[in-house]
Amino acid sequence: MESVLNEIYEDWFFRDNIADSLPMAKYLAPKIKEYLNINSVFDVGCATGHWLSVYEEHGLDVSGLEGTTNSIPHMMVDSSKINIHDLREPYQKNHDVDLVYSIEVAEHIEPEFADNYVDALTRHDAPYILMTAAPPGQGGHGHFNLQYKAYWIDKMQAKGYSIYEELEDKIIEWCKIARETSNAPSEFLRVAVDGDGTGLLAGQVRPVSYTHLRAHETTPH
C-alpha cells in the first residue's frame, strides 16, 4: 500500500508543501503553543514535518505520522520521530501528547478509511485536537474526500470530543490581524489569506478544533 501512496505523493508534492505551508506554521504555531499552554504535539499527516520543526524550535516534544517514505528526504525533524503508516490500515500506537493536529490531511483519506483517520486523531485522548479539511468544490492533488465541517464534527463527537470554538475564532482572528496589519511574512499572507479573506484559515476552510469532554476543566479562557 505504501507504493500506492508513493505514486500519488511524489517528490514534487513535498517540495511544494514546504513552500506553501512553512510560513503559516512559523506564524501560527507559536501562537497556538502559547494560547493552549502545551508541551507536546503529534502531527497526523505531517508531510515533511515542517509544522513539527517550528514547534520543536519553541521547545515542544514532537512526533508525527506520515503515509509515504517519499517524505523522508525532505523531513525537517529527526526521522526517528516520524511513524510511516498508511491509514488504509488502522493506526495502533498511542502518544501521550497535549495537542494532536492535522492540517489539510482529511481530504486525502478515502471515505471508506475516514474512520481510521479519525481514530488516529482521537485514540491518544489528547486534551486538544486541531484540524483543517478541504470542503466540497475545492480542488487539489489527491483530494478524495471533500466534506463539509459537520461531517468531521459528527465523527469527532462520536469519539468523545466537543467543538472548541474559542480556538477556532482565535486562529481566524490571528489571520485577519495578519492580513490587515501585514504582521506576518508575505508568504504567509499569500498562502493563508489569498488576498480576499477566503484562504486556508481565513474563510471558507475554517479550522476545526476540539477539546476532549474529560478535559473541559483545563480549557483556557
Where are these regions (language model features)?
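Short glycine-centered segments of the SAM/dcSAM-binding site in methyltransferase folds
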Residues: 127-128
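Conserved N-terminal segment of class I S-adenosyl-L-methionine
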Residues: 1-103, 112-124, 135, 139, ...
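A short, hydrophobic C-terminal helix/tail in secreted or cell-surface proteins
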Residues: 215-221
